[in-house]
Amino acid sequence: MKQSLFISLLLLFTNVAFAQDAKLIEAAKKDGKLIVYGTMQSDIFEPLQKIFQKKTGITVDYWRTSATKVMERALTEARAGKALFDLVMSTEDTQRIMLKEGILTKYESPMWKDFPKEAIDPQLGPRARNHIVGVMYNRSVIKPADAPKTLEDLVKPQYRGKLVMADPTLHTTTAQWLANLHKLLGKEKADKFIRDLAAMKPVLVESFAPAADRVTTGETPIGITYVYYVFLNGQKGAPVDYVRGDYRLLGDASYMSLFHKAPHPNAAKAFIDFFLDDESMNLMAKAGEFVNRKGVYPPVPDADKIKFVEMDDLGESFYAEKRKEFQKLFR
């Protein structure tokens, strides 16, 4: 089994009790297991699996992929009436689509009270984590003095052939990021930036993870990806950093939601309670996640200075139109 990068944190937290409803736990134990489809790195999720199993005896099976693929698999299984999963953990835009399709149901965890009211969606619950998108670069290939200083620097001629990003015709969150750039640059500058970015002929990959991997190896030294990969890949010795700019960075929220026909509903509810608990949130932050708790930051350089600008969910029909536009620009 793959060793967790955070096994020491697992040992630290195994003796910490989390408050849960006794009746729910008893019912959850009868379920015996639960299945989660999610986007969280396996190295971060694994300690949570082990802690929860140690506390409850309930097994957690986890399938990890991109947000788009989580959504696609969940919808395919649900439509076929052959769903195996209990919980989906993914970005807000994909959760909205699944909610609209009617496959998610509301579970109001007692842990909601520990989150700011403005961070709680009436249907999806607390915005547990913020996925912050930025520009990551390899310091061994691109010296800090030569690296882009702002987002707009990314399209300068010297970076042509050195860029990687998720394919916006396939990756929902990248399409969302491009469509929300006006929040940082204004509409006119954002439109020009997108055209210029496409003209740079970036390497297109499936999602943010392989984009970060290519930056880490230096194969493509600059990439658009989640900022937490700076910590995650840096922990493995990679010489990576991210472009600060004015610290305003777009991002998406992550939610964990209950499938409306969950095979193991009580175990799933118990896991949601555990996942939103203070100890779990702190564990995730120490592992590089931007959790939505005031004053709790990941060990990413200048994490406390980042000004999170939440991306709007623009709807499935909008993304369908945008994908056509991006197909012409990026392909």
Provide a role label for each language-model segment.
Residues 13-19:
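Sec/Tat signal peptide C-region and signal peptidase I cleavage site
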Residues 93-97, 216, 221-241:
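A ligand-binding cleft/hinge motif common to bilobed small-molecule-binding domains
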Residues 21-29, 33-35, 39-59, 233:
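Short, polar/charged alpha-helical segment
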Residues 114-117, 130-131, 161-169, 193-198, 204-205, 274-297, ...:
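Periplasmic-binding protein-like
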Residues 134-141, 178-182, 253-267, 275, ...:
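A bilobed periplasmic-binding-protein/Venus flytrap-type ligand-binding module shared by bacterial periplasmic
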Residues 298-331:
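Extracellular/periplasmic bilobal clamshell ligand-binding domains
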Residues 35-49, 61-78, 82-219:
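Extracytoplasmic ligand-binding site segments that recognize negatively charged/polar headgroups
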